[in-house]
């Protein structure tokens, strides 16, 4: 009996040490305008079973706006955090503005659905690497993208871009026939939308 009790205590300790059991739901569609949107515009959600009011990291993958795939990086999976990996459409199938709109639409989906996965609408952080960093910067700084979905960019808890371009993205410049060595800052550059607030 003592051995069984000791084993139960040890197992409870392991569960407490490693946190709650994580669940994962893959391939939830957030935009279905056409067949291509239906295929590409999906999210994966990793969350702790039974959790409530958790911070949410919405992760956008890199790939130059022309490739890559939705992911939930192991490095950001932490106890107490809901992580949403976002897929989006690529150039040249759609224009860069449409890709940014995909990012905003994904944020709308997170805002409207994250509570059922234990997340909090007041604790949504946007993050991404490379092209993903560019997308989260555009969605957060050019308020018109989220405003289209009745969301206020100022209500985001934070934005954490990794290696995202602050000037107009090279894929947008390429689509206009502008050399990738010629930097421009226009309405498709995050730094164009930097605000004092």
Language-model features: locations:
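Short beta-to-alpha linker loops that shape the active-site pocket of alpha/beta-hydrolase fold enzymes
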Residues: 63, 87-94, 165
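N-terminal cap/lid segment of alpha/beta-hydrolase-fold proteins
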Residues: 19-51
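Short amphipathic alpha-helix adjacent to the substrate-entry channel of hydrolases
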Residues: 69-86
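Sec-dependent N-terminal signal peptides
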Residues: 4-13
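Short beta-strand element of the alpha/beta-hydrolase
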Residues: 53-62
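Primarily recognizes the serine-hydrolase "nucleophile elbow" in alpha/beta-hydrolase
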Residues: 111-174, 186
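Alpha/beta-hydrolase active-site loop
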Residues: 94-115, 138
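Serine-hydrolase catalytic core
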Residues: 183-197
């Amino acid at each position: 009996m003592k051995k069984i009790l000791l084993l139960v205590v040890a197992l409870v300790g392991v569960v407490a040490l490693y946190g709650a059991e994580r669940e994962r739901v893959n391939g939830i569609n957030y935009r279905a305008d056409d067949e291509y949107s239906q295929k590409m515009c999906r999210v994966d959600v990793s969350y702790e079973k039974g959790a409530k009011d958790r911070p949410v990291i919405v992760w956008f993958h890199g790939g130059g706006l022309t490739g890559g795939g939705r992911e939930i990086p192991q490095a950001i999976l932490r106890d107490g955090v809901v992580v949403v990996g976002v897929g989006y459409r690529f150039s040249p199938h759609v224009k860069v503005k449409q890709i940014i709109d995909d990012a905003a639409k994904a944020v709308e989906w997170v805002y409207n659905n994250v509570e059922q996965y234990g997340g909090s609408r007041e604790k949504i952080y946007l993050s991404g690497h490379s092209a993903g960093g560019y997308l989260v910067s555009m969605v957060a700084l050019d308020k018109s993208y989220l405003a289209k979905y009745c969301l206020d960019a100022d209500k985001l808890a934070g934005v954490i871009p990794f290696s995202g371009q602050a000037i107009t993205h090279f894929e947008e410049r390429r689509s206009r026939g502008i050399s990738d060595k010629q930097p421009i800052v226009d309405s498709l550059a995050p730094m164009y939308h930097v605000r004092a607030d």
